[in-house]
Amino acid sequence: MKQRIEYFDLLKGIAIFLVVMGHVITMCIRGIDSAFIFKLIGQVHMPVFFFISGYLTYKDSFAAPALKKRFLQLIVPFFVVSALWIWYFPHSSLGSPISASVPDMYCSFWKDGYWFTLCLFMLFLVYWPLSAVLRRCCHLWQQLVAVVATYAVLLYAASLWSSETENFDIAGLGLLSWFFPIFIFGVFAKKYSAAWLKVTSSGTWLTVAAVLFPLALFTIVYPWDVPFLPEWTCIFSRPLLHVSVVIIAVAAVSPWSSREFAPVAGAEARPSIVARFFKYLGTESLSIYLLHYFFLFPLTPLQEPLKAIGLPFVPLAAIAAVVALCIVAVTLFVAHIIGRSPLLALLLLGKQVRK
């Protein structure tokens, strides 16, 4: 159990660092969203969070107390921090487009960056009744039918009340339908943990994932290059992309975690600085997500030089990583101070701190 939690923390730590790197590219430097590294980062980090959430959710009974805990952890800071962000943004010197008011933000598709906590809570709400149905299904095929039917309902609802192109989505249904499959995949990975272990340790499955990943990624981020594919095919390609990402990520990070955190000659483990760094980021991933926007700063003078050299992967990744490291450090410091106040910790970090 301990090792599993540690490799999940490593995965979350790497993923949240990629989140900040992506925002450095799109909000600090700006104007270079066509860079491949941005498109890559934008597709690989969030599936990890939703998979882990689904995996850890399977053991929950989802009675009212569990939902109350999720509400306090996710929805309270969603409303408070997003409102503060809308107020603060005009003073940030960032030039990225953002909603003019809090009501506009709540009606937008991406919620000005704060969509994740709302989407995750909505997934818990959907899973609550679905879990009761799954418990009553005696066979795997019956469970899959229930999951596919739920997915179809979410897709239909999203088609009626959500539009990324029009930047409209009051209830968050669009992103809910995007990430429902990988969340449920996490649930099934926990339920059938022995089979999941075989998948992540199998060279065959890793090869399949490595082949599917670039193909699915290409159809999602460069749809204009595959005009022969109907738009609706994304309801299949996106889940395939997310599952491929998770298989590759777990297959890579789990052995690393075992090496880093395994006891040495009967003594306590001595993980490297890198492993300890990403593990710590993983334990503070929600705090980093909620607060890091406030510490982004303009880097627009870098736009033209980077465009002039063709937006190369390595220099852009290096710049984004260095800036992200600084932003994460400041964010963690502020989160530590906020965490000393139980009220502020709840409102701004989603943490319930006992006095």
Cite the ranges covered by each PLM segment.
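Interfacial loop-to-helix transition and helix-capping segments at the boundaries
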Residues: 34-46, 104-119, 160-182, 218-245
